[in-house]
Amino acid sequence: MDYHMDYIPNEVISHQGERFVDKYVDRKILKNKKSLLVIISLSVLSVVGFILFYFTPNFRKSDLFKNSSVENNNDDYIINSLLKSPNGKKFIVSKIDEALSFYDNKMKDINKNNNNNTSSDFKGLSLFKENKPSNNFIHNENYFINVFDHKFLMNNVEHINQFYTFIKTNNKQYNSPNEMKERFQVFLQNAHKVKMHNNNKKSLYKKELNRFADLTYHEFKSKYLTLRSSKPLKNSKYLLDQINYDAVIKKYKGNENFDHAAYDWRLHSGVTPVKDQKNCGSCWAFSSIGSVESQYAIRKNKLITLSEQELVDCSFKNYGCNGGLINNAFEDMIELGGICTDDDYPYVSDAPNLCNIDRCTEKYGIKNYLSVPDNKLKEALRFLGPISISIAVSDDFPFYKEGIFDGECGDELNHAVMLVGFGMKEIVNPLTKKGEKHYYYIIKNSWGQQWGERGFINIETDESGLMRKCGLGTDAFIPLIE
């Protein structure tokens, strides 16, 4: 089976500042206010839609829709085009002004009818989890987004729209307006970093905002970078050392030479699809399970999907969602007598789960595992298969989009991934205008196929593979099933 992918770049989200205002909301008139706001919002959108529809035949003459096509003239395209156009923003503001004037008049009538002498004009909207009726709006709560302030709207409407799209796309839920505000600020900070990086023409890779965009690096690190420091197991019955490596590589390599420039196991049916560890610090399990899956694909011609959840639950040398070691995973995998398939023992992320080794009758095991010398990574990769490795990740890593990663590294080994290939790409130097060869390792990650290049990342190296950026391969193991 061929796992080679075409990688499609996405738009990078831009950045501006954000302003929040405080407003007290009276519960007694909330329901009426909310209904009116819905009616007003629908009215404004209807007016916008009607005007755009009415002038659609002449849209080619308008700068707003320049270089567009009829097929692209859908709701999302129209809204995004309006948001990018100063005249479009002014039009929206004028319609909101009209709606707000109508709303204020209605609110005066409502206040009079309810004999409410303490009500205030409603000036803000909030985005947060509506798990309880009382959470729709909260007395004395701060930080409502002021969408009726002209300067705020003109300066931030694009980013509010982007943040809303981010929330919707990633199914984010916030427990309060205050949390929403804090996440929005983090989102904007990350957006700024992404924009600044992508403006650097010297970098070999691009960034993008993704599901991690509302997390600080400290939060991201504590949740996803949970690899423990490797401690060689003394007197292990299963770990093959340097002496055994020479014997094993000779068995599969013989006297054959190989091209140090490029080899990709995805092109040789040796890599199973990228998975997602979700909200569990289980990178160690995905790295070790993935390399076992690759061995069955390469040696047995079996495409199987094994259970990371069984390792998370039953690898007692490791710490479940709180981290672990690759070599401990292989040790426990052997002690357990093999691993069930993912169908028999499905992944549930960070949900509590007790170990149940009897969920399946057929298990897939390994005989032992091999420690790969850090100066033999390309050789081992080419002749033995994908390798479970450690790496030192920094805050540049989470927002990787495409290209050859040449960013900053972490100061400690904190993540487990898979080494699945290596390659070379000739890139024109923007200063010399000459093509330069850039070598890289191909890494399979466990953050889903929406991250990076369909779940993979390319990290710079040299032709020999001895350059191990970010400590790549300091811990390197291959499971053996024969």
UniProtKB/Swiss-Prot annotation:
Gene Ontology CC terms: extracellular space; food vacuole; lysosome; membrane
S-S pairs: C280-C321, C314-C355, C340-C360, C409-C470
Intracellular or extracellular location(s): Vacuole; Membrane
Gene3D superfamilies, A to Z: 1.10.287.2250, Cysteine proteinases (3.90.70.10)
Propeptide segment residues: 1-241
Enzyme Commission numbers on file: 3.4.22.-
Residue ranges of the motif Arm motif: 426-435
Cytoplasmic side: 1-35
Matches recorded under InterPro entries: Papain-like_cys_pep_sf, Pept_cys_AS, Pept_his_AS, Peptidase_C1A, Peptidase_C1A_C, Peptidase_C1A_papain-like, Prot_inhib_I29
Segments on the Lumenal side according to the record's topology features: 57-482
Glycan-bearing residues: N67, N117
Residues spanned by motif Bipartite vacuolar targeting signal 2: 84-105
Alphabetic keyword roster: Disulfide bond, Glycoprotein, Hydrolase, Membrane, Protease, Signal-anchor, Thiol protease, Transmembrane, Transmembrane helix, Vacuole, Zymogen
MF-aspect GO terms: cysteine-type endopeptidase activity
Membrane topology qualifier: Single-pass type II membrane protein
GO terms of biological process kind: proteolysis involved in protein catabolic process
Lineage: superkingdom: Eukaryota
Residue window of motif Nose motif: 242-258
Homology family: Belongs to the peptidase C1 family.
Subunit comment: Component of the hemozoin formation complex (HFC) composed of falcipains FP2A and/or FP2B, plasmepsins PMII, PMIII/HAP and PMIV, heme detoxifying protein HDP and falcilysin FLN. The HFC complex is involved in hemoglobin degradation and detoxification of heme in the food vacuole during the asexual blood stage.
Listed name of the protein: Falcipain-2b
Source organism of this protein record: Plasmodium falciparum (isolate 3D7)
Designated gene of the protein: FP2B
